[in-house]
Amino acid sequence: MFTDKAIIGLDLAWKKGNRSYGVIVNDGLFLEKVFSFTELSELEELIKEIPSGIKLIFIDAPLNFEKGQKVRACDREFLKKGLPILPFNEKIMEKFYSPFLGLELRRFLESKGFTYCGSFSENSFYEVYAFGNAMLVFGVKKKTDFLKNWKKLLFDFGFTGLSKLKNSHFIDALLSTLPYFVIKWNFDVFSLYKEKGYCLFVPFQ
């Protein structure tokens, strides 16, 4: 049953036209629903159906980049801690992921009244690094190691309804929501990087 907030995690396809995956979690860590979509109009309908007053969306995909930069400034915060990242810059986007969905999704959500990097008390959306979240919260270093024990780790964290997660895309979507709960509990795990147009949860500074 939904509370006053719906926490939405998205494992977003980087290239437009590919399938994206999502989860909806309530404030009590119960996994209410999983879904997938290809068109943003489908996502819009799903969001409209959510009865909760406040909707917070955590997106596992780049939502901003600086032209001419090999490594994004926000991603460097993970590298400083010795944590690997998925490289992303203008050249990579144009070569492998054009047309790129992340930038379109950002414009779409802003047009619907969502605030980029807003507070948890208003409809807001944020960029996250899903496996980076897992590395910081669970101390795992390899994705394969996490996937061997993902259900126990997430259950011990407090999530319920995990039987709905049928593939790794849904798991990544759920991992995307971790910053909300960790920050809500006042643990010093994440900082919100808000510089140069970025809005990414990074290792605590």
Where on the chain are the PLM-derived regions?
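RNase H-like (RuvC/DEDD) metal-dependent nuclease/polynucleotide-processing core
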Residues: F2-I8, L12-Q205
